[in-house]
Amino acid sequence: MDSRQLRYFIAVYEQRNLSRAADQVNVAQSALSHHISNLEAEFATPLFERKSRGMDPTAAGERLYEHARIILRAMAEAETEVREGARVIAGEISIGMANSGVKAIGVELMRTVLTKYPKLKLSLTESLSGATLMHLMVSNVDLALVYNPPSEKELITEAVLEEEMFLVGIPRLVGKAKTPIRFEELSRLPLILLRYGLGLSSRALLDDPVLLKRLEGSAILHANSITGMTGALVEGLGCTIATKLFAREELAAGRLVAREVIAPKLTRTLYLCRLRNRPMTYAMEEMRRLMLSLIAEQVREGAWQATLVE
């Protein structure tokens, strides 16, 4: 098996058709079929189901596709680093962030990459924190800013900052912003919580899973959309537990208020994560440094109300 065979395999997988795949990689259809057959012989298992209208990947084909993408990307990055020479930041890098991370440093990160690293192609993915972690676990992103990630042996995590969570909503529901509210009182409020997929609220909400479970029991709605959540809050459909950064624009405009929660205070921790089996490239090292620098700057200037983890 070599890189050419993997490229051919990926073309067939993505096109689901030998003829279209052959056109994509510019080889004869018979030659492409021969390479796929050789791969199947090497793995001793079918990679595709041959049908009259195309080719569907088998379970083995699905697994090989994920590995092939990672292998070819690693090879391309290795070639770029060797060709460009030491410490030249080039190639491709993909970074995943939760909404808060993008809101705080996304624009400046993109601006810096465009101006300082013209040979680097950045892909920035925004999603809920749980989805961001999944993007990292399947190697769709190289680095990820994730709240309260689980302890997984596959992950290398670096605590970056700690944020306080507030009760956020319209004054009629939340009450006076200057007066703290006790945690036990939250159960009497119409809470709307973010949810990722079919599971419970994202671990990103709180550091304490026991408190998170108690909040879950009080929720009247769950949302898998930042836009939907914000709209519901402004319309007074409910209130939520969030950071001030989450609703920064609405708080500044007076459409929403944030009320401190006490007994206990609610916090969450942001981590910079990467996969343990993914070697650090020059680009990854530089983006890690840049992201940490931008975050620290936002915290020092008060734009991101949080405490840096030393």
Model feature map: region roles:
Residues L155-I192:
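Flexible hinge/capping segments at coil-to-helix
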Residues E40-P57:
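A short LG(V/I)-centered, amphipathic sequence patch enriched
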Residues K244-A253, A263-E310:
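C-terminal effector-binding regulatory domain of bacterial HTH transcription factors
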Residues P190-K213, M280-Y282, R288, E297-A306:
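Secondary-structure junction motif
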Residues I10-A28:
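Short helix-boundary/capping micro-motifs
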Residues L128-L133, M137-N140, V146-Y147, G197, ...:
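Hydrophobic hinge/microswitch elements
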Residues E42-F43, L64-A86, M287, M291, ...:
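Alpha-helical linker/hinge and terminal dimerization helices associated
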